[in-house]
Amino acid sequence: MPVVWPTLLDLSRDECKRILRKLELEAYAGVISALRAQGDLTKEKKDLLGELSKVLSISTERHRAEVRRAVNDERLTTIAHKMNLSLYLGERPSYSMSGPNSSSEWSIEGRRLVPLMPRLVPQTAFTVTANAVANAAVQHNASLPVPAETASKDGVSCSDEDEKPRKRRRTNSSSSSPVVLKEVPKAVVPVSKTITVPVSGSPKMSNIMQSIANSLPPHMSPVKITFTKPSTQTTNTTTQKVIIVTTSPSSTFVPNILSKSHNYAAVTKLVPTSVIASTTQKPPVVITASQASLVTSSSNGNSSSTSSPISSTVAVTTVVSSTPSVVMSTVAQGVSTSAIKVASTRLPSPKSLVSGPTQILAQFPKQHQQSPKQQLQQVQQQTQQPVAQPSSVSQQQQPQQSALPPGIKPTIQIKQESGVKIITQQVQPSKILPKPVTATLPTSSNSPIMVVSSNGAIMTTKLVTTPTGTQATYTRPTVSPSLGRVATTPGAATYVKTTSGSIITVVPKSLATLGGKIISSNIVSGTTTKITTIPMTSKPNVIVVQKTTGKGTTIQGLPGKNVVTTLLNAGGEKTLQTVPAGAKPAIITATRPITKMIVTQPKGIGSAVQPAAKIIPTKIVYGQQGKTQVLIKPKPVTFQATVVSEQTRQLVTETLQQASRVADASNSSAQEGKEEPQGYTDSSSSSTESSQSSQDSQPVVHVIASRRQDWSEHEIAMETSPTIIYQDVSSESQSATSTIKALLELQQTTVKEKLESKPRQPTIDLSQMAVPIQMTQEKRHSPESPSIAVVESELVAEYITTVSHRSQPQQPSQPQRTLLQHVAQSQTATQTSVVVKSIPASSPGAITHIMQQALSSHTAFTKHSEELGTEEGEVEEMDTLDPQTGLFYRSALTQSQSTKQQKLSQPQLEQTQLQVKTLQCFQTKQKQTIHLQADQLQHKLTQMPQLSIRHQKLNPLQQEQAQPKPDAQHTQHTVVAKDRQLPTLMAQPPQTVVQVLAVKTTQQLPKLQQAPNQPKIYVQPQTPQSQMALPSSEKQPASQVEQPIITQGSSVTKITFEGRQPPTVTKITGGSSVPKLTSPVTSISPIQASEKTAVSDILQMSLMEAQIDTNVEHMVVDPPKKALATNVLTGEAGALPSTHVVVAGMTKCRESCSSPSAVGPPLTTRKIEAAGVPTTGQFMRIQNVGQKKAEESPTEIIIQAIPQYAIPCHSSSNVVVEPSGLLELNNFTSQQLDDDETAMEQDIDSSTEDGTEPSPSQSAVERS
C-alpha cells in the first residue's frame, strides 16, 4: 500500500531519546495505573512490573514513586475499591481478588527505601503572612467534615474500606514527609484553638510554631498550636532571626538546651546553644542578636516554650546557633561572653566553651542584643544600647541581683559598645543559681563591661561596653556548707558586677548551684563582700572580691593577720581597709572556669603590713559542671596535702565543705589532705608568702594532691565547670607558716633543692607550656623588694620546683620530691604552680605579683621564675641581682620554660621569663601566634594562634638548653631591649612563647596585637633561679629588667616593666586557660596524669611565676599592654579558648605604690583574670598550693595583690584588694573534659619531652 506520508521525520537523536523516554515512562505509569485499578498488588503483578521495569529502564526509585502516585490517586483507589467489592460477587477472575484492603500491598511496594528526613519549617519573609492564611484555612477546615466522609454516598462500605487505606497512607506520608511536630513537641502547645497569638507576638517564634503546625499531618491538625510566648515576643521585631532558646527548668545547668530546643522548630540552631547551655549549669541562655533572646534564656527556666517570656526571646539565637556549642546559651547563663565565643569556635566541646575574648567580641557584635523588647533589628539593637538596658533590668542588675527574688526571670541586658556585646541575664530557675544573674552595667557605653553570668557551674563574664565602672557591694547571706542551693534567691547569690572595663559577677552561693559541678567556696556568712572588677576592656573576666567583713568562714584556717585590702574606687581613689587578723577575705567562686579571681593585697601599704598581707593562699576547686556529677574526684593521691598546716586544712575543709554543699559537696568537705574531692587542690592556704622577710615558709601548700584527681566525667563540660578561686591572703607569716611551711618542709629542702628537682619535671604538658609566665616575672623594681624577693624566692623556689618539674621524680628535696611525684601522679604538681607568693617587699607590687598566679600562666610562670630568681640571693649561682628591683633573678626562667614546654611541648618551661618586655611579647606575639597555633592544634585550642610567639624564639626553645643566648637574641629581636630577659627567653624560646601569651590571647583581645607596639615591656620573667638553673641563663639581672609598664588599651593591657617604678608590680598572668584545660585532663587521670601533671604543673608553675615584684612599677598603663597579659594566656594555648580570657584579664595592672595613676594596670589585671577564668572554664587553683599538684589541672588562678593604691585604670573600676582572702576556684568545666582529651595529646607531647629531651628547666636544675 503506498505510503502517503513520510516515514522519517526531521527529529534529532536527542529529540528521539526524549520522546522514547517519555513513552517508556508513560507506558510504565499506565501499566501501574491499570494494575492499581485492578486491585491490590499480587506476586504476578510484581513479577510483571519487575520485568517491565527492566525493559523500560525504570529505576527502583521511579518504580516506587509511580506506585506511590497510584496509591494516592483517589480515582484509581475508588475503581479498585468498587471492583474489589464486585470480586466477592465473583464477577471478575479470582486472581485479582484482594479483598477490601486493595492498597496494602501497593503501599508496601511504594515505600521509600530511605524515609524522608523531617525538615524544619523554612522561614521566609512571607512566613508570617503564609502562617496567618494557613491558620485561617485550618480554622475553616476544622469546621468541615473529614474528607473520607465526604466522598462515599454509599457510604458505609466505601468509607470503611477506604478509610483504612487512606489513613494508612496518610500515616506513611506523614512519617516520610517532614513533620516538625515530632521533633518539636514542646513547640506545639495545644493551649488554644487559634494560632493567631504567635503572629502578634514574635514573628519568628510564632512563625516557627505555626509552620510546624502547618507541617503537621492532617490528622494532627485538630490540635491547635498556640504559643503563649508570642505575646511576649510581640515587642521584639528583631526576632526575625529568632532562634528559640528554651530552657526548661529541668534542663537546669547541664541539661542540653537541645532537649529543650527540640521543642521549637528553630531548635536546630538552638540545639547547639542548648548544648552549650547544657555545659553550663544554668538553663542555657542564648545570646540573641536581640536582648530579648537573652531574656528568653533566662526565661528558659520556665520551660515555657515561649522562648522569651520577658523579652522577645527569639532574638538572635543565630549567634548561638552558629556555634552549635552555643556558648551563647551558656553565656546567657553565666558564660556570656566567653562562652559565646567558644560556641562559635566549636560547638561540640564544652571545653571550647571558653574562647578567646576576641572571638567573643567578634560574636557579640552580631549578637548585639536588642533590648529584649525593643529594637526590631539587631543592628539597631547593636547601636542602641540604651534601649536594651531599659528593657532589661540588667542595667540595675547589680542591685537587682540582691533585690530580685530568685523567681525573677533573669533579665538580660546586652550592651554593645566596643563590639563586644554583653548580655546579662538573671537566671530564674532555682536550678540556675540565683547568682547567675549577671548584672551588666549598660550605663556607660565607653568602657567595656564584663557581665558575668554564672550557670550553675560556670561563671562567665562578658565585657560590656559600658564605660563606667562601678562597684557593687552585696551582702551575701550567711552561707552554710549547703550554700550551694542558695541560688534560688538572687539576693543570696552574691554577684558583683562591675561596669567598668570588666565586671565580674561573683555568685558565691550560686556556685554551689547544682550546676552540678560548681563548688563555690562559701562566702563568709553574714559578711558583706565587695567585689569589684577592674574595667579592663580587654579582659573579659576578672573577679575581685573584697570582703568587708573581717570574717569569712572559709578563711578561718588562715592565721589571723592584719590584712589590708585596698579598694580601688572607680574614681581611682583607693580606700584601704584593714581587716582584723581573724578576718578572712571573701571567697569568690566563679561558676565558670574562665573566671579568674584576683585577690589583691595592697603590697605597698606599709612595709610592715606587707609581709603579712603578702601571702595569699589560694585554693581552687574545680568541678566539672558539664557533668551533673562533680567530676572532681580526687585521685586521691595521697599527697603532701596532708602536710598542709592545720590552718590550711581548716580553711580547706571549710572551703570544701562550703563548696561541697554544692554538687561537689559529697566529698569536698573532706580535708585538704584528702585532696578535697572537691578536687580543689589548693595550694593550700598559704600559697605563697610574700612577706618581705625572707621567710622561708613557702606558701606552697601542695594540697593540690587532689588536683591529681581524675575527673571522671570530663567530656561533657570542661568549660562549663565553674572555677572557684580560693585565695587566702593572710599575713604571710602565718599563712605561709602554716600551710606553706608544711608544704615547704615537704616540698623544699631549699629553694635550691627545688631548683634541682625542677629538672625532674621533664614532662611538660603542652597545655602547661601554653601557660606562659613570661609576663609575670616582672622585674621587681625596688631595691626594697630584695627582702621580699628573698622570701618570695624561697616560695618561688618551692613553687617552681613543684611547677617546674612535672617529672618531679628527680626533685632532690624529699618533700619536694614527694610533691613532684605526687605531681607526677597528679600531673599537676608543677602546674599547681604555686601561688605566687606575694612579693611582699615594700611595694604593693608584691601583692600584684601574687596576681602572678593569675591565670596567665605565663605571667605566673614568669613571676614565679622571677620569684625564684628573686628568691633570695638564696638562689645560688643563677641568681642575678636586679639593681632596679633589688631582686635576684635566677632560673626563674625555668619555670617559665616549663610553661613554655607545656605550650610548646618543649621542656622549656624555664623560659617562662617570657620576655618581660611587653613589646617583645607583642611583637613576638604574632610570630608566637603561629607557634601557638601549632601548639593549639596540639591542644586543640583555637585561641592560641594569634599569640604565637616568634618562631625564632620557639626554635630556640628547642635549642633552649643549648643556646639560651640565642633565644635572648630572638627576644631582643622582638623588641626586648633587655638581654637578661632575652637570655632567659633565649634559654627557653618556649618561654618567649609564654611571653607572647602574656601579650595576650589575641582572640581574647584584638588589642593584644596593638600591644606589640610597646617595645620594651619586659616582664623579666626570670624563672626562679632555683628552678631555672639551666636557664640559668636566666641571667637577666633584675636591674636589666625594666619595670613593667602596663598600657591598658580597651582590649589589651600592655605591661612594660621598667626598673624605675617600684610601686608598679603587675602580675601579668594571663589566665592560662589553656593550661587549665589540660589540668582538668590531668585531674581526670591522676596516674595518667604524670605526664598530664606536667602540663598542669606547668600551668601551676606559670601561676606561681605570675607574681610580679611589688617593687616593679608600671611606667605606662597602656591598654595595649593588656595584650601582654593576654598573651600569657595564649601561651597557654593548650587551653586556648580559655586562655584568651585569662590573658586579657591577666595583665595585672601594675600599680605604682606611689601613684594612684597606676590604677590602670590593676584594672587590666583584673580583667584578665575575669576573662581567663570564664573563657577557659579553667580551674584556677591556688598557685601556691597545688602548685604542683592540685593546681595542676586547671590551675591558673590569678591571685594578684593589688596595691592599695588607687589605680586609675581607663575603666576606673574599683579594685578590691583582699590581702587575706581565700579564693576558691572551683572549676567544673568542660575544660576538664578538654583536658582529658588534650591530656592525651599533651601527655604525648610531654612524654616526648620528658623522655626525649629534658626540659630546659630540668637541665638547668641539673646543671645547678
Curated annotation (Swiss-Prot):
UniProt xrefs under SMART domains: ENT
One example GO MF annotation: identical protein binding
Subcellular location, record wording: Nucleus
Region (Disordered): 145-179, 364-407, 660-700, 1232-1264
Domain ENT: 16-114
Keyword Ribosomal protein: no
Compositional bias of kind Polar residues: 660-671, 1254-1264
Function: Regulator which is able to repress transcription, possibly via its interaction with a multiprotein chromatin remodeling complex that modifies the chromatin. Its interaction with BRCA2 suggests that it may play a central role in the DNA repair function of BRCA2. Mediates ligand-dependent transcriptional activation by nuclear hormone receptors.
Subunit structure: Homodimer. Interacts with the transactivation domain of BRCA2. Interacts with CBX1 (via chromoshadow domain). Interacts with ZMYND11. Does not interact with CBX3 or CBX5. Component of a nuclear receptor-mediated transcription complex composed of at least ZNF335, CCAR2 and EMSY; the complex stimulates the transcription of nuclear receptor target genes such as SOX9 and HOXA1. Within the complex interacts with CCAR2 and ZNF335.
PANTHER family xrefs: BRCA2-INTERACTING TRANSCRIPTIONAL REPRESSOR EMSY
Protein name: BRCA2-interacting transcriptional repressor EMSY
Phylogenetic classification of the source organism: Eukaryota, Metazoa, Chordata, Craniata, Vertebrata
Gene that encodes the chain: Emsy
